[in-house]
């Protein structure tokens, strides 16, 4: 992902304030609520019967945290996202058979959650930088599909 110096600063400054457990759980939970077909990959997570059940599900929260911890690694390696996410791409492609479109959806949900959490601090330029990052991460995760 090519970010300007200002964009890198904006992304890393805001990310330093992110509670990965809270934001990760909310982002994954919202993905499962807003795009219910994504739930088929999480059938082992127990009760996904309603929005409240999903948002309160400890396995959803734990996996959301895991996802954002991986995203954090990507932020440290913006110049090598494909390398950073190669093993995860392989896992999601070959073993889990996740539709790569889901990575794009999750990235967009993450941007919405960040906007909700940070309000006025999540300015249009900050959003633009994050959109570049989540698109780059989604492309890296989809890499093994091509």
Swiss-Prot record:
Residues 2-146 form the Globin domain. The modification N6-acetyllysine is found at residues 59, 82, 144. It holds the Pfam family Globin. CDD domains: Hb-beta-like. The modification Phosphothreonine is found at residue 12. Coiled coil: none annotated. The modification Phosphoserine is found at residue 44. SUPFAM superfamilies: Globin-like. Heterotetramer of two alpha chains and two beta chains. Belongs to the globin family. This is Hemoglobin subunit beta. The lineage of its organism: Eukaryota, Metazoa, Chordata, Craniata, Vertebrata.
